[in-house]
Every structure is written in C-alpha cells, then in structure tokens.
C-alpha cells in the first residue's frame, strides 16, 4: 500500500479545492449585472472557486454586523485589478478575538481564528445565531488561497 498518502488538512484543501471552494477552472455564464443605474444581461467569465473565496470572507464581515449591529456601520469592498487584490473590511469590533496566546492551543488567538481550520466560536448549537459562518472554514479558506492576508 505504498500508494496510500496522508495529507495535512491544508494540503488537502490545496490539492482538492473542489471539495472546499468549487471548481477552479473558469466558466462562462450570463448574469444580470448592475451597469450604472440599470441592470443589463452580460456574459461573464469567472472562477467559481474565486467567487466562493470572496463570498467566504464577505460573509465573515457581514457576520460581524449580525453580532454587533449598532457597532458596524460600514462594510467595504475594494478591488485593485492591477495589484490583483481584493480588500474586504468592516468597522466593527473584533468581537472577542483578543491578541493573546490561546492557553489550550499554544498559538496567538488571531492565528487560531484566521489560520487554523475547524476553529469557530459558532459551535455551540444551544445558542441561536443568525450568521453565515458555522463550520470553521470561511476566513481560513480565504487565507489558504491568498498570497497575502491581513
């Protein structure tokens, strides 16, 4: 059984992206797109995986608004085609992500939250929540597939 391989979770995410974010190959489809003040049907070429990564981090920003509706007054998206970057930000509080060492895991809390798969504050099913992120993948998938994540 020399052909049996064991991958780390991150290696698996990178080797089998379709399991986590969908197909990476570009597809072409027609969509209604806002063009100025009206919608027009346009043919778009895009990567479903890239769209999913964008969606995952956008949902994280929106979840901050769900948890702190009066504190979050702005969610911004900036796309820089020349730099090849997408920036999503909100002005909400970090919501309990303290910059200190996590006692049990031995890593900094922000690293645990944004860099370790399957970590989440939304695993307590006894609490009613209206959030998109529940499984501990969202921001981490964006981080894994990004060349820069801050």
Report the location of each language-model feature:
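GHKL (Bergerat-fold) ATPase N-terminal catalytic module, capturing the glycine-rich phosphate-binding loop
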Residues: 1-150
């Amino acid at each position: 059984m020399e052909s049996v391989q064991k991958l780390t979770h991150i290696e698996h995410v990178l080797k089998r992206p379709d399991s986590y974010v969908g197909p990476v190959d570009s597809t072409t489809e027609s969509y209604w797109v806002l063009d100025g003040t009206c919608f027009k049907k346009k043919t778009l070429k895009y990567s479903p995986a890239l769209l999913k990564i964008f969606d995952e981090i956008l949902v994280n920003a929106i979840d901050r608004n769900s948890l702190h509706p009066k504190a979050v007054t702005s969610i911004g998206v900036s796309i820089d085609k020349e730099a090849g970057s997408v920036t999503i930000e909100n002005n909400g509080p970090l919501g309990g992500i303290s910059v200190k060492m996590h006692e049990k895991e031995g890593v900094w809390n922000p690293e645990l939250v944004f860099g370790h798969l399957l970590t989440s504050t939304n695993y307590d099913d006894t609490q009613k929540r209206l959030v998109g992120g529940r499984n501990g993948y969202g921001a981490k998938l964006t981080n894994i597939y990004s060349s820069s994540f801050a």
